[in-house]
């Protein structure tokens, strides 16, 4: 008896794709990057096939994302934001400190051994008068909750036939034949293959140049804390000798819970993730010199590897890199998934315009728009986050603190400068995108039917 041929598509599909079946775009990768890419392209009217790897389930507030207002508009337009099963918390103010002793508070439980001549800090946001609208710099969302919302949206698109999920992985891709080979020997013709996977598969190693990589030999200790005071929707970041510490507001009773992202030497981060919560709280209070009050650990902690990775080319023939396949940046500025959303929305725009003009998806001039814009944005973000991650622990630390202090005083005194800095933070744009129109989805606009 002949054994049945394994299906190419997952359970949601009703039929098996035959050899050389054609699809507009094939998306490969894992996690949220692959899902949002497929959803953006489906929203633009393209037939999409997706092979993604399941992401591990996470506790709701162990890991968070800081999404820009433009990112929220995009997710609302795709009807994803409305399905989040955990509320978000807005950031209305942000304070950055060059060291713990620069934090000014009357509730400090310890005294710093070094009193700064003047504190080095930089603030975003400003007090609003009565009746004025509060400006939101970013939205803190649960990574687990967003993952579930994306999965739900993806399943809906699979059910209505706009996206087909592949159960069999891709093992090869021929750009000249516009053909992807699956592990069961089945071929699929596609105009474009988009990869979002951080670790390049063998077929991508043939098509794309090696990425530039830097391992920080550090880990981000992440989890949820409860403070002894309300967070007031304030995000705080301190450049500690061990690495940057970020405390981000999350929804909670009394508005006292915050998400922690603490960059530490990898061995220490892994050790702290395994010890008693009270010891972690003690170490955190010690590192911050008691300036931020008392902490209680809520739930389990985890460690995320810290790496910098930037692809040399975002487009190689008919292979397009997006998300983690194109860039991995230090999380201190919270720009990782914002970069991915800007990638996916712009690529959907570029391919939509390509089709409107009657050009082939592999048209070099059109794809160059995506590559030039997105690589410049990622390169600038990578350079900025890498520089900040190392600046305050380098020989230039004192000079950096002085520069931050001067800038902070200038911003506090100059209303126009403060408004300009707030506007850029609020727009969700990098410097490279200033003057360029936002992609449709980030403007809150849908594609024409």
Residue ranges of model-derived segments:
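Short gly/ser/thr-rich secondary-structure transition/capping motifs
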Residues: 4-11, 175-179, 300-309
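Glycine-rich FAD cofactor-binding loop and adjacent beta-loop-alpha segment at the N-terminus
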Residues: 5-11, 17-26, 30-92, 97, ...
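C-terminal helical "tail/cap" subdomain of flavin- and related membrane-associated enzymes
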Residues: 5-8, 349-449
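Conserved N-terminal helical subregion
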Residues: 9, 18-21, 84-207, 212-220
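Generic enzyme active-site microenvironment
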Residues: 50-51, 193, 322, 329
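Conserved FAD-binding catalytic core of PHBH/FMO-like flavoproteins
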Residues: 75, 187, 192-293, 298-301
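FAD/FMN-dependent oxidoreductases across multiple families
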Residues: 271-354, 361-362
């Amino acid at each position: 008896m002949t054994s049945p041929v394994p299906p190419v598509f997952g359970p949601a599909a009703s039929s098996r794709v035959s050899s050389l079946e054609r699809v507009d775009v094939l998306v490969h990768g894992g996690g949220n990057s692959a899902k949002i890419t497929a959803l953006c392209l489906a929203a633009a009217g393209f037939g999409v096939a997706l092979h993604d790897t399941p992401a591990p389930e996470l506790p709701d507030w162990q890991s968070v994302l800081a999404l820009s207002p433009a990112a929220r508009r995009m997710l609302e337009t795709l009807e994803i934001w409305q399905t989040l099963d955990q509320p978000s918390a807005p950031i209305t103010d942000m304070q950055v400190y060059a060291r713990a002793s620069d934090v000014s508070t009357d509730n400090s439980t310890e005294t710093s051994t070094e009193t700064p001549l003047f504190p080095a800090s930089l603030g975003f946001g400003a007090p609003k008068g009565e009746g004025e609208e509060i400006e939101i710099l970013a939205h803190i969302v649960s990574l687990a909750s967003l993952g579930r919302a994306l999965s739900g949206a993806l399943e809906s698109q699979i059910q209505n036939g706009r996206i087909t999920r592949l159960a069999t992985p891709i093992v090869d891709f021929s750009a000249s034949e516009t053909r992807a080979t699956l592990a069961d020997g089945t071929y699929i013709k596609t105009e474009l293959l988009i990869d979002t996977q951080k670790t390049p598969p063998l077929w991508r190693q043939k098509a794309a140049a090696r990425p530039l990589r830097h391992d920080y030999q550090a880990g981000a200790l992440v989890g949820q804390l409860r403070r002894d005071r309300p967070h007031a929707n304030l995000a705080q970041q301190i450049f500690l000798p061990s690495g940057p510490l970020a405390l981000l507001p999350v929804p909670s009773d009394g508005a006292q819970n915050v998400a922690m992202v603490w960059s530490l030497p990898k061995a220490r981060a892994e050790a702290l993730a395994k010890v008693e919560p009270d010891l972690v709280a003690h170490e955190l209070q010690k590192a911050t010199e008691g300036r931020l009050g008392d902490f209680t650990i809520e739930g389990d902690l985890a460690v995320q590897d810290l790496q910098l990775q930037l692809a040399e080319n975002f487009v190689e023939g008919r292979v397009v890199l997006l998300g983690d396949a194109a860039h991995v940046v230090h999380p201190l500025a919270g720009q990782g998934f914002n970069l991915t959303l800007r990638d996916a929305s712009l690529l959907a725009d570029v391919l939509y315009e390509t089709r409107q003009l009657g050009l082939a998806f592999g048209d070099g001039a059109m794809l160059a728009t995506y590559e030039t814009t997105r690589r410049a944005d990622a390169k600038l973000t990578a350079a900025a986050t890498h520089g900040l991650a190392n600046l305050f622990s380098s020989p230039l630390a004192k000079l950096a603190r002085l520069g931050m202090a001067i800038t902070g005083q200038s911003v506090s005194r100059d209303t126009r400068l403060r408004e300009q800095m707030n506007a850029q933070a609020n727009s969700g744009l990098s410097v490279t995108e200033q003057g360029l129109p936002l992609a449709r989805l980030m403007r809150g606009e849908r594609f024409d039917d």
